[in-house]
Amino acid sequence: MERNVETFLGCDKEFDEARIVIFGAPFDSTTSYRPGTRFASRTMRAESYGLETYSPYQDLDLEDAAVFDGGDLELCFGDTNKALADITAFTEEVMQAGKLPLMIGGEHLVTLGAVRSVAAHYCHTSDCT
C-alpha cells in the first residue's frame, strides 16, 4: 500500500509499521440540499497541519503514533452500491493486515461500508445481530 503525499497531521509512517490506517471516502452522491462532502477528507488533511499534535495532559505527541495515511479511495460517483462495496473491501483489507481502519470524509452513508466490514470481521456469532 502506498502512502498518501498529503497526510493527516503528519501521519507518515509506513504501512508495515503502522497500527492505524487512515483513509478517505470522498463520496456525496446521496447528499441532499448541498453536495461537497466528497472534499472533506482532502480538506481535513490540509487543515490538520494547523493543529497542535502534542498533548501536555497526556504527554504524548500524535506524530509519534504509528499511523499510516493511505489517501482517498477512488469511489465511483453516482454508483452508491459500488462505492459502499469498495469501502467495505478496503476496510476488510486493512483489518486482515491486523490494523485498525480510520475513515475520514464523505457523507454519512459511507460509514455503512466500514461498519459492514467491521461487523463481518468481529461478529462471528448471533450476538451481533
Language-model segments: residues:
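Metal-dependent C-N hydrolase catalytic cores
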Residues: 1-128
